[in-house]
């Protein structure tokens, strides 16, 4: 009984310690990039919080009124992450976004420069075999090609797309930092902080 009680106490503490260690490691990567023009780094960022799942039945790409929209909290989260990145003083090569309105608005609210739309970042929520989808292939190819470029490339997209590329499941308004190695494999190097979310 004593052993069981000990485990009930120590296990949550261990999980907390491991989470803090992982978070500290991820932030160290950002510390190393501070004030630089990093070569080959890409931030895959999930759009900020937009209540709901998937897309409404009447979804139309060019009509934001038919799509899920960011909540006020989601908009503030996007601004906060943008300010956090600005304080890092990392050179931004470009900000790209899915054509979905919630992704575009997130990218714009980051406030890190003009947003370029990239159809290969569009949501694959309704698709099968996302890992082998042509859009996933094209984004992976773009990240590999970015190895030769300086400046952080920011790509704002969707949960399923990013998970297919990295194996990481992101909450709304979170991002994962990746870089391709010489073999074209994507390495996960860090993540954006929760910033109180």
Annotated model-derived regions:
Residues 3-7:
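N-terminal export leaders
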Residues 9-17:
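Bacterial N-terminal signal peptides
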Residues 18-24:
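Sec/Tat signal peptide C-region and signal peptidase I cleavage site
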Residues 25-119, 124-127, 168-196:
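Active-site-proximal alpha-helix that buttresses catalytic centers in soluble enzyme cores
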Residues 40-42, 151-157:
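Generic beta-sheet signal
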Residues 129-137:
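Short, surface-exposed amphipathic charged segments that create phosphate/polyanion-binding patches used
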Residues 137-147:
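A short, acidic, amphipathic alpha-helical segment used as a generic capping/interface helix at domain edges
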């Amino acid at each position: 009984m004593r052993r069981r009680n000990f485990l009930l106490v120590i296990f949550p503490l261990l999980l907390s310690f491991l989470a803090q260690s992982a978070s500290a490691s991820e932030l160290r990567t950002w510390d190393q990039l501070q004030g630089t023009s990093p070569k080959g780094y890409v931030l895959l960022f999930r759009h900020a919080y937009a209540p709901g799942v998937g897309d409404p039945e009447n979804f139309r790409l060019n009509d934001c009124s038919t799509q899920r929209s960011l909540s006020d909290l989601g908009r503030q989260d996007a601004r906060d992450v943008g300010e956090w990145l600005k304080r890092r003083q990392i050179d931004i090569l470009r900000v790209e976004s899915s054509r979905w309105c919630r992704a575009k608005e997130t990218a714009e609210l980051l406030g890190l420069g003009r947003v370029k739309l990239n159809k290969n970042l569009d949501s694959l929520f309704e698709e099968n075999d996302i890992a082998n989808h042509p859009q996933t292939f094209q984004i992976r190819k773009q990240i590999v090609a970015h190895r030769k470029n300086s400046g952080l490339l920011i790509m704002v997209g969707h949960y399923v797309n990013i998970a297919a590329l990295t194996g990481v499941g992101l909450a709304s308004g979170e991002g994962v930092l990746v870089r391709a190695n010489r073999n074209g494999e994507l390495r996960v190097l860090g993540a954006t902080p929760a910033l109180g979310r």
